[in-house]
Regions:
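Terminal and linker regions of secretory-pathway proteins
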Residues: 2-530
Length: 530
């Protein structure tokens, strides 16, 4: 009987799989100019998603390898023809952008086995487009192992192709202002995509994509700016100065791998260094120093894997992957690739918002901010450096600090970690809304910027991973020890000088006496002294 039941269930499962509608590849319809049909077929059953209007499907971005990016689009609840639209990309690399949808900014969230409307959704006044990027993340798939990307050039080419096809199916967004956004490793995707859009517009001689700004949350922009993890853990009190010394061989090896541009070694050493620091401090994750564990990020996966939900999303039999290890590993060569020049180019044409959660250990705020001031050079840099850094308010409380000028807005969010929209949803909605509107964040009542509170920027050349001696910032004994060493050296030198002076004086006295009292001639004096 058990065998019969098992066979029946297997056949039922197989029948269900075979009955699924194939994945909806809109590219095939676009090529035939069946754009309206493509749009109609991509409609998602709203009954499964709290009656929210949305569209989903796939765009082919590499025909030879049959590589396809999955998208899910939500027109704004308060839609108007000029409503801004936001493209959201998750980090990882290799993580699904549906994590941003369900866990952070989308119209709904999945909690306690049910969908609920999100109070602080970005989707009320902005249309939201989520793309699973790169190939392999989420529902995005390829038919070939060669379909997994290894660099940002391919990544930006794929995303640009998907955006072009998307705008053909949804032409109402073509002239609307576009903001490309994301967090963490998306700090590498977004500059690459922004430059691709800029270059394509230049090539055709018109503003084809109405890109207005880039929004990056806790972005991973350059490894050298956040290489000194041991000092970061020290500053948070997670290890002491002896702990810093204990991991110094690993820290120095990681620094050297970065300077040598040894991607494989740097990737491995970073993981080993963070694991060692976490073991020493019993820090269970690096996303938020105030939280023991980050749970429930993938709770929604069980929901979208339901047959009726997969059918509604038009994914056919494509398997969903929350985080694709292959996609992650394939991007290892990009680990140390240079991003700064792309950001500098974009700052000369677009506005950029970088927000950072204060409690993040993965991409901590302070070293990243220092690197921006020191290494980024664009034509309006002086305006940013001279701008005052001021508190900003939300709900009658200081929500963080903002510095804005020369196309760059830098915001620190108090109490948030790596996933800022999840930790501080209302505050994050406020800051992106004000940025998109081009407005200043609210300041405390009666707050006045004092000129003397913003000193001229001074470039500190003593910082960086090239320093040969690891000094522990803030160690009260490090300064004392240095003074003691200098004092000892000076005292020893002084003592030697006194001894030499006494010896030389005695020798001079003997020789002078010999000359005066023993009638030693000048030749003998010279030979004795020299």
């Amino acid at each position: 009987m058990k065998v019969f039941i098992g066979l029946f269930l297997s056949l039922a499962s197989l029948s269900s799989s075979l009955a699924r509608t194939p994945a909806l590849i809109l590219t095939q319809l676009i090529k035939k100019n069946f754009v309206e049909q493509a749009r109609n077929l991509s409609v998602v059953d709203p009954k499964l998603f709290l009656n929210r209007t949305s569209y989903s499907g796939f765009f082919t971005v590499d025909e030879k390898l049959n590589s396809n990016l999955f998208f899910w689009y939500f027109p704004a609840e308060n839609y108007k023809p000029d409503t801004p639209w936001i493209l959201w990309l998750q980090g990882g690399p290799g993580s699904t952008s549906l994590a941003g949808l369900f866990d952070e900014i989308g119209p709904f969230e999945y909690s306690n086995n049910e969908l609920k409307l999100r109070k602080s959704s970005w989707g009320r006044d902005h249309s939201l487009l989520f793309i699973d990027n790169p190939i392999g993340a989420g529902f995005s798939f390829t038919d070939s192992p060669d379909g997994f990307i290894q660099d940002m050039a391919t990544c930006s080419s794929h995303l640009y192709s998907a955006l072009r096809q998307f705008r053909l199916v949804f032409p109402e967004v073509s002239k609307a202002p576009l903001y490309i956004a994301g967090e963490s490793y998306a700090g590498r995707y977004l500059p690459a995509l922004g430059v691709k859009i800029l270059e394509q517009d230049r090539a055709i001689g018109i503003l084809d994509v109405n890109l207005q700004g880039i929004i990056m949350g806790n972005p991973v922009l350059s490894r050298d700016s956040i290489a000194d993890y041991s000092s970061i853990y020290y500053q948070w009190g997670l290890v002491d100065s002896q702990g810093v010394q204990a991991v110094k061989p690993l820290q120095d090896a990681y620094n050297k791998a970065i300077l040598d541009e040894d991607t494989e070694s740097a990737t491995e050493l970073r993981e080993r260094l963070l694991n060692r620091l976490d073991e020493m401090s019993m820090q269970q994750q690096t996303f938020n120093i105030l939280v023991d564990e980050i749970n429930h990020l993938d709770d929604f996966v069980s929901y979208i894997r339901k047959p009726e939900v997969s059918e509604a999303l038009h994914v056919g039999s494509i398997e969903f992957t929350f985080h694709n290890g292959t996609a992650h590993k394939k991007l290892t060569p990009d680990f140390l690739s240079e991003v700064r020049s792309k950001v500098e180019m974009l700052l000369n044409h677009y506005r950029i918002l970088i927000y950072c959660g204060q409690m993040d250990l993965t991409a901590p705020c302070v070293p990243n901010a220092k690197a921006r001031r020191k290494h980024w050079h664009w034509n309006k840099r002086a305006q940013f450096l001279s701008a005052a850094r001021t508190p900003w308010m939300h709900d009658n409380r200081v929500a963080g600090y903002v510095k804005s000028g020369g196309s760059l807005t830098e915001v620190l969010v108090r109490g948030a970690g790596h996933l800022v929209p999840m930790d501080k949803p209302a505050e994050t909605l406020v800051l992106i809304s004000y940025f998109i509107k081009g407005q200043d964040l609210p300041q405390p009542p009666n707050y006045h910027v004092m000129v003397q509170d913003t000193a001229a920027y001074i470039d500190d050349d003593t910082e960086g991973i090239s320093k040969t001696i690891l000094q522990v910032p803030g160690d009260p004994h490090s300064g004392t020890q240095a003074v003691m060493v200098v004092s000892i050296v000076l005292n020893v030198l002084l003592l030697l000088a006194i001894v030499c002076g006494v010896v030389y004086g005695l020798r001079w006295k003997r020789r002078t006496d010999a000359y005066l009292y023993n009638n030693v001639d000048e030749t003998s004096i010279t030979s004795t002294m020299f």
